[in-house]
């Protein structure tokens, strides 16, 4: 009789797998090994106790992330109505258990109420699951007050593992504690035709669990609407959030005038329809998927976006390689910058190693660099030095020609600091000076670069007592001695004669000798009397100033700026000044020389370049000035 009824209705009940269907069907004839609550026929008003839930053993990291991001939408966009979405692992079926009631409590328990409206075909003909379902007994639908199914309505299920999402009517009835009613025929149009793949079982379920998140299912809407009877309470306690997108298609998702009860709380009608809950769950899952994709995109592109935000341009494709070296001899350090750090990764210094150049090449570079005029510096901002290139307006200027050739990994080469080498270098410079006078043009002499670059500095040249004599002196030579007789001359005539003689001997110097000596007296008075600097510091300032004068860098416009910058540089190099002492010195220079503070500070670097960065002076250049300062004080 059970087989005939099943054949007449062409329906069977479904569970998570074929083994679950067999266990649920045989539960009508044989009691399960575990104690189950018996149907309460005598007292239908009192519901039986709810069987213990089987603990779920399939939580995944992705499901935890989806649950955490349930109500979070990072993109801020409303989900499209026809977008695909999946329930993840929530769409999985319940594992086959020992009892029929526990096996029938699947995660899609919402379909327990839908079984009252029609039977659902369990498997395709010829499969073992269909045979077990047909031989175990008829499908017994529950009486309900559902409206009739739509004529011709059917469900098409494609994809593996779809039947695991449906609940068995046998298990649902046993779980709800209701009396089984005689079977009634159901139309063929109200039954769903399921297409299952082979391989059901323990090995196939794990593969199906990964694929059931995105399954397209179309089922009549009336099959999923509960009647709201009290008897279907425990069997219908499912979660709408577990539905995938195919449970209620768009064709049946139009709002209707019927009032459906909520499956979360059966018995309360009309507050929230099942359609609204299903749509809300669908939008929530779409938001979860988009949130996960947005998070992955943010994590992948965070460094690029941060770089664009900080620099305002895309991140460069190729970065400069950084090498940590311990032995500098093993690495090519040319055209690179070396950062010296300690063993604890503390910054110490940064430097570059430049290739060695011959002295002849250095001289050529000096001549070429001396002929270039500094047109980038305006007269309003700063009065520049002639022949000094500062690299303004974005230009790059190299000062490698001012560096002394040294061995970077060994001892320093001999320089002109010693007495013997100084005499040799002086003879070489005199020969170069004579060559320069013979081959140089008048245009190059006007700049003063040739004479100034090749002429060695003599600290006694500008302070020679023979300069004031001029043509007014008379030299008397005797066998044992020589004497000079100077007639009385007006001071103005003597000064004029001295300047003319100095101009004839040094035509590239634009200042007169009397003006140079006057500036030196002002520098000494300001440094010693007003600021309290010592004689060695003043002697260094004299050397700086005379070098600039002999190179032809001084003129009428920048003479006081050069004098003030020389005193400031000498005070910084030769004295250990505090911050307030440097400020006091700048105030005095501004007051005595009537300078602008901003121009004075900005003029330090041009003077430094004109001095070829040679601020540490040898002893033979400073001592003559120091002796004269000590004698006159």
Curated annotation (Swiss-Prot):
Gene Ontology terms: cellular component: cytosol; nucleus
Chief location of this protein within or outside the cell: nucleus
Inducing stimuli: Up-regulated by progesterone and down-regulated by estrogen in benign endometrium.
InterPro entries: CABLES1/2, Cyclin-like_sf, Cyclin_N
Phosphoserine: modified positions: 168, 287, 313
Tissue specificity of this protein: Expressed in breast, pancreas, colon, head and neck (at protein level). Strongly decreased in more than half of cases of atypical endometrial hyperplasia and in more than 90% of endometrial cancers.
Low complexity bias spans: 1-29
Subcellular locations according to the entry: Nucleus; Cytoplasm
Region (Interaction with TDRD7): 1-109
Coiled-coil annotated residue ranges, if any: none
Positions of region (Interaction with CDK3): 179-492
Residue numbers of Phosphothreonine PTMs: 415
Assigned protein family: Belongs to the cyclin family.
Known function: Cyclin-dependent kinase binding protein. Enhances cyclin-dependent kinase tyrosine phosphorylation by nonreceptor tyrosine kinases, such as that of CDK5 by activated ABL1, which leads to increased CDK5 activity and is critical for neuronal development, and that of CDK2 by WEE1, which leads to decreased CDK2 activity and growth inhibition. Positively affects neuronal outgrowth. Plays a role as a regulator for p53/p73-induced cell death.
Assembly description: Found in a complex with p53/TP53. Found in a number of complexes with CDK2, CDK3, CDK5, ABL1, TDRD7, CDK17, CCNA1, CCNE1 and TP73. Interacts with CDK2, CDK3, CDK5, ABL1 and TDRD7.
Annotated protein name in UniProt: CDK5 and ABL1 enzyme substrate 1
Native organism: Homo sapiens (Human)
Classification lineage: Eukaryota, Metazoa, Chordata, Craniata, Vertebrata
